[in-house]
């Protein structure tokens, strides 16, 4: 099986460092949805070494800054990854989603990433 992130040559890279790169997601949840992807093929964030994790943090902060400069309406972010098929991972190459959020982009954002299990999202009203 081929890996989309390893085999693709037509990616528009926004920023890169020695360990990973950032691209705009072609199936965005919100405008400017960005993916951070390691060059080394590993399935999960949990397979990264410390240098790669540090590089992720640096690129994540840099991309956050860039996004805030591009769109003054961004008022928050969701940051996350899916690890394993049962967690929703469909591309078995580690990648982190940086999803810009704007006031009013959904009716009730309460619970954020807890929404992966919709019944558990609004934990204060359970």
Regions found by a protein language model. Name each.
Residues 1-126:
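HIT superfamily nucleotide-processing domains
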């Amino acid at each position: 099986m081929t890996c989309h992130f390893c085999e693709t040559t037509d990616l528009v890279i926004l920023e890169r460092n020695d360990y990973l790169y950032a691209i705009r997601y072609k199936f965005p949840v919100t405008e400017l949805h960005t993916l951070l992807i390691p060059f080394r093929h590993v399935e999960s964030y949990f397979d990264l070494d410390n240098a790669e994790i540090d590089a992720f943090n640096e690129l994540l902060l840099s991309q956050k800054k860039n996004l805030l400069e591009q769109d003054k309406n961004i008022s928050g972010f969701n940051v996350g990854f899916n690890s394993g098929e049962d967690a929703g991972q469909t591309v078995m190459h580690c990648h982190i989603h940086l999803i810009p959020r704007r006031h009013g982009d959904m009716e009730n954002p309460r619970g954020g990433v807890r929404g992966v299990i919709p019944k558990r999202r609004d934990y204060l009203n359970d």
